[in-house]
């Protein structure tokens, strides 16, 4: 479960909309920052190919910018709406994978 689920939705929305959030200035979405867990690896495996390619490109650009100690021009920052949609999609897939893993564990017991 994501930490975002524990926080009030209004706080999460205001956090994602604020311009001081550095990940947006590098073109990343919030879900791009998730730790690489076993469940997330399965989620990435299930993503459509074009979505996965876009995510990989965002990560490569962010790594390059980080090494150069630069930020994107404001016109190229990540969009709030697309960020929210991508994060919701990843959360939905993650919940589904976790339910499947719980079901598998219950059959093993």
Curated annotation (Swiss-Prot):
Stored SUPFAM superfamilies: 14 kDa protein of cytochrome bc1 complex (Ubiquinol-cytochrome c reductase)
Membrane topology term: Peripheral membrane protein
One GO cellular component term noted in the UniProt record for this chain: respiratory chain complex III
Predominant subcellular localization, coarse grouping: mitochondrion
Keywords in alphabetical order: Electron transport, Membrane, Mitochondrion, Mitochondrion inner membrane, Respiratory chain, Transport
Compartments (UniProt record): Mitochondrion inner membrane
Gene Ontology BP annotations: mitochondrial electron transport, ubiquinol to cytochrome c
Main function: Component of the ubiquinol-cytochrome c oxidoreductase, a multisubunit transmembrane complex that is part of the mitochondrial electron transport chain which drives oxidative phosphorylation.
Similarity comment text for this entry: Belongs to the UQCRB/QCR7 family.
Protein name as catalogued: Probable cytochrome b-c1 complex subunit 7
């Amino acid at each position: 479960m994501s930490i975002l689920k524990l926080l009030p939705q209004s706080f999460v929305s205001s956090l994602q909309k604020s311009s001081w959030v550095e990940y947006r200035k590098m073109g990343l979405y919030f879900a791009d920052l998730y730790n690489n867990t076993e469940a997330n690896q399965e989620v990435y495996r299930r993503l459509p190919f074009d979505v996965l390619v876009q995510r990989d490109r965002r990560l490569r650009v962010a790594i390059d910018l980080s090494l150069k100690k630069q930020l994107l021009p404001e016109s190229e920052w990540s969009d709030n709406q697309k960020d929210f949609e991508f994060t919701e999609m990843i959360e939905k897939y993650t919940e589904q994978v976790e339910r499947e893993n719980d079901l598998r564990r219950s059959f093993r017991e």
